[in-house]
Regions:
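Sec-dependent N-terminal signal peptides
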Residues: 4-15
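Active-site glycine/GP-rich loop and adjacent strand/helix microenvironment
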Residues: 18
């Protein structure tokens, strides 16, 4: 489960970095339902994946608007697509308050996590703090034109000396991230668009204890 957790940490960590990084965090707004962005990612310089972030739905609970964020990871060297869906507040500042997580690994049934399972996932993501650096302890290098597989983008370039990471963000891209490089990962935008639907069509089973 390590690599999916790292990818969750990238997504959630981007938006929970803290008030000192407002310039960076302001760009990391979650898009409207249906918008998506797909990346080529490499972990530990050896594990290539195609990763898609998407907003696949929305709910209103207890007077608060929530969004279903989906992370889909497709490994290049082996079978076993992994899908995570996270129900989170629509505000980037509150994204750490995950309400539910649904996971599907390969052909296995989709499983729904809540309660203690969600807390455990949060704890694992906290331990992977080196991937929470997209907006953590960063300085703005400046505006920079970057070329990635998706094309050429005018970005804001951020760098963290503490975490040896760099990120390039653009307002026009869903989830804002165009490129990110850290000690153990690299990500570059392949394509983006609208019309994303849930990659999980079945009713998820509960991972909680059976009663």
């Amino acid at each position: 489960m390590r690599k999916p957790i790292l990818s969750l940490a990238i997504l959630l960590g981007m938006a929970t970095a803290g008030q000192a990084q407002e310039t960076c965090i302001e760009q990391l707004k979650f898009p409207e339902v249906g918008r998506w962005a797909e990346y080529k990612a490499v972990y530990n310089q050896k594990d290539p994946y195609t990763i898609r972030y998407a907003v696949v739905g929305g709910e209103r609970r207890e007077g608060k608007d929530l969004k279903w964020l989906e992370l889909r990871m497709v490994p290049e060297k082996k079978d076993g697509t992994i899908i995570y869906q996270m129900l989170v507040p629509g505000s980037a500042a509150e994204v750490g308050d995950v309400q539910e997580i649904i996971m599907k690994s390969g052909a296995r049934p989709a499983m729904k996590m809540d309660g203690m399972m969600v807390k455990m996932i949060r704890g694992q993501m906290d331990k992977q703090s080196f991937l929470k650096d997209v907006c953590k302890d960063v300085t703005l290098v400046g505006r920079e034109r970057v070329i990635v597989p998706a094309g050429r983008f005018q970005t804001r370039h951020f760098r963290s000396e503490k975490y040896s990471s760099e990120s390039w963000l653009a307002d026009k891209v869903p989830f804002a991230m165009v490129k990110a490089v850290g000690k153990n990962y690299e990500m570059a935008l392949i394509r983006s668009g609208a019309g994303a639907k849930s990659s999980i069509t079945e009713v998820p089973q509960s991972m909680g204890p059976k009663r």
